[in-house]
């Protein structure tokens, strides 16, 4: 069936004559795909390069939470993302960060109050309040958080494992969605209590397979896809929301329901009634696929115009605060003996487990039991470093470090020896922000000039350098996607235990705890 487009919108279906006509015979036309929740910064790409990459995969709208750059740069970071987004064909719609810092325990580069967010209200491209991570603040009536929620009609959630009456109270307070579900019973409870459930498939947060049974013809309108945190190499290799559609269909979901989640359901969740469907009056945002089951995107159209590669557009990067003091090996030495708290990495998830191991500090690293040292360095005020123990990185030598460390984005490192940890941290500081793998004098690195979070390089070069980092880390024995797991080690709003610039943090107890049990 033919359809016509005028001034960026679909005018109708039937026979129309146009100044330019496209023959799409034999292909399938699908509404432009929508990512319901993403941190663009996690791709390690500046917004223009991110747009180039995901547009090629049929995505025409992303709902972005810029809380990574906001934690580093404050309100100017949000201004940067809005301005950069306005320069791309991709619609980058912003949910304002609700928790900067993520918790009162986090030491980042900025604090954003309700008054700070109020100036963005009504600004073009701003659609609501992003994931409310401070669950205790909601439940116990934090006044500034309440004021932030009152600014916006659309409020996203972040409530891993929240259940029962606490979940009731969280929803009653005005939170409408969650993207943190990792198990089917949790997702069902939240859906039955009226929340939108965003099924997440990121580089390490791979929840689609486990949550797919949630979706059927009745529930699909309340479910959508989100990538949350997906590195550039995964975007280039596996895709974006098109990847979620393919995985859902191969997992047994009807293609119509998968496409609805990727389009109309996501648009409806955010009140974007101008997109998400091919209908008169809607934006002419659509992609062309070879087959709905394989769903290989061939072409993408934005407001009726085919999106072509406009070439590399160097970003005007915000300054990256970097006042970290590179530690001496003695600064990160631990002492003691006994039952130690050890952070266990959970493959395919960003949650961790709080383990207990008998440990003699003199025997760390313990390569036989895969117990390594994890270090977090304050990059904003040079106040020092915190040390914890981690199981699951599998490094047999060397160290990895980076300035991408949710949500405060201090410098985080894991290594099989103090000297290499120090070298890796020193390389990140030298770069002014970035990722590094170090083994002796052998160093592989990726500079992240934009706030220590995003690269100023074209996406294909970022993908190449990421591959070099991964290969170097692999030779040292590291787990796959080590930098994505590394980036979540200090995230104090995801259970069970973390490490910050102060030391070990118990998420359930919501407090700092000693490394060795007393």
Curated annotation (Swiss-Prot):
Cofactor entry: Mn(2+)
Keywords annotated in UniProt: Hydrolase, Manganese
Entries under SUPFAM superfamilies matching the protein: Composite domain of metallo-dependent hydrolases (SSF51338), Metallo-dependent hydrolases (SSF51556)
Assigned EC number: 3.5.4.2
Reaction equation(s) it catalyzes: adenine + H2O + H(+) = hypoxanthine + NH4(+)
GO biological process, one term: adenine catabolic process
Statement: the UniProt record of this protein carries the keyword Manganese: yes
InterPro entries per UniProt: Adenine_deam, Adenine_deam_C, Amidohydro-rel, Metal-dep_hydrolase_composite, Metal_Hydrolase
Keyword Manganese attributed: yes
Catalytic class of the enzyme: hydrolase
Alphabetized GO MF terms: adenine deaminase activity
Pfam families listed in its UniProt record: Adenine_deam_C (PF13382), Amidohydro_1 (PF01979)
Similarity comment: Belongs to the metallo-dependent hydrolases superfamily. Adenine deaminase family.
The protein's name in its UniProt record: Adenine deaminase
């Amino acid at each position: 069936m033919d359809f016509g487009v005028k001034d960026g919108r679909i005018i109708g279906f039937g026979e129309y004559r146009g100044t330019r006509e496209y023959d799409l015979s034999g292909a399938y036309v699908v509404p432009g795909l929508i990512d319901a929740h993403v941190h663009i910064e996690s791709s390690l790409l500046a917004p223009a390069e991110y747009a180039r990459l995901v547009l090629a995969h049929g995505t025409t709208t992303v709902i972005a939470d810029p809380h990574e750059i906001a934690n580093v740069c404050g309100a100017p970071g949000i201004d940067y993302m809005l301005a950069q987004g306005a320069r791309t064909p991709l619609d980058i719609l912003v949910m304002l960060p609700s928790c900067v810092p993520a918790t009162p325990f986090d030491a980042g580069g900025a604090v954003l109050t309700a008054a700070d967010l109020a100036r963005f209200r009504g600004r073009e491209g701003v659609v609501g309040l992003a994931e409310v991570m401070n669950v205790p603040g909601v439940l116990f009536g934090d006044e500034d958080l309440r004021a932030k929620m009152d600014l916006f009609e659309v409020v996203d959630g972040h409530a891993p494992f929240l259940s029962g009456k606490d979940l009731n109270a969280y929803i009653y307070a005005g939170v409408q969605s969650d993207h943190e579900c990792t198990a089917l019973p949790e997702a069902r409870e939240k859906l039955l209590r009226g929340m939108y459930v965003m099924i997440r498939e990121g580089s390490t947060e791979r929840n689609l397979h486990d949550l797919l049974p949630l979706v059927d013809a009745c529930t699909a309108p309340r479910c959508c896809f989100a990538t949350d945190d997906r590195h550039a190499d995964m975007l280039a290799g596996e895709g974006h929301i098109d990847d979620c559609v393919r995985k859902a269909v191969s997992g047994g979901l009807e293609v119509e329901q998968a496409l609805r989640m990727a389009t109309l359901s996501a648009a409806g969740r955010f009140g974007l009634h101008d997109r998400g469907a091919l209908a008169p009056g809607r934006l002419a945002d659509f992609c062309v696929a070879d087959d709905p089951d394989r769903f290989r995107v061939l072409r993408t159209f934005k407001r009726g115009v085919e999106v072509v590669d406009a070439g590399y557009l160097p970003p005007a990067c915000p300054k990256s605060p970097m006042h970290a003091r590179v530690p001496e090996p003695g600064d990160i030495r631990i002492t003691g003996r006994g039952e130690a708290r050890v952070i266990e990495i959970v493959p395919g998830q960003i949650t961790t487990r709080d383990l207990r191991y008998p440990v003699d500090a003199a025997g760390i690293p313990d390569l036989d039991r895969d117990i390594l040292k994890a270090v977090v360095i304050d990059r904003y005020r040079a106040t020092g470093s915190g040390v914890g123990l981690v199981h699951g990185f599998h490094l047999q030598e060397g160290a990895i470090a980076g300035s991408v460390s949710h949500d405060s984005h201090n410098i985080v490192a894991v290594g099989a020896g103090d000297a290499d940890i120090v070298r890796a941290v020193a390389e990140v500081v030298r770069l002014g922000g970035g990722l590094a793998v170090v083994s002796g004098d052998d160093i592989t690195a990726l500079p992240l000039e934009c706030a220590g979070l995003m690269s100023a390089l074209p996406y294909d070069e970022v993908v190449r350098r990421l591959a070099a980092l991964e290969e170097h880390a692999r030779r040292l024995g590291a787990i796959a996607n080590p930098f994505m797991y590394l980036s979540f080690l200090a995230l104090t709003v995801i259970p069970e235990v973390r490490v910050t610039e102060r030391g070990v943090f118990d998420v359930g107890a919501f407090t700092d705890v000693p490394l060795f049990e007393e």
